[in-house]
Design a protein with these regions (language model features):
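Catalytic core of pol beta-like nucleotidyltransferases
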Residues: 1-23, 29-35, 46-94
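Conserved G/P- and acidic residue-centered "switch" motifs that form tight phosphate/ATP-binding loops
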Residues: 26, 40
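Short hydrophobic/aromatic beta-strand micro-patches
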Residues: 42-44
């Protein structure tokens, strides 16, 4: 799980782009993370961001959190993975 300070950093970084929902999934959500784990974040933005903006946000989150971040948008989530993501998903902002 992530700390409330880490949640604040995530929300602060992503708030510039008006997210409708932000959640974590994967090993951090299940409490199975270790020092090699990345932090999987699912986000639904009000407006579409281009690839460079998403990469920039991912890098900013990685730098500010000190954890490798994978930023996934709701619209880019494949139908095959949707079930697994939703099963683990812990919303941190709506």
């Amino acid at each position: 799980m992530i700390s409330s300070a880490q949640q604040d950093v995530i929300i602060d970084v992503l708030s510039k782009h008006k997210p409708r929902m932000v959640g974590i999934f994967g090993s951090y959500a299940r409490g199975e993370n270790d020092e090699d784990s990345d932090l999987d974040i699912l986000v639904d933005f009000e407006e579409s961001l281009d690839l460079l903006e998403l990469i920039g946000l991912e890098q900013e989150l990685t730098e500010n959190l000190g954890i490798k971040v994978d930023l996934i948008t709701v619209h880019s989530l494949s139908p095959q993975l949707k079930h697994y993501v939703e099963k683990d998903l812990i919303p941190i902002a709506t």
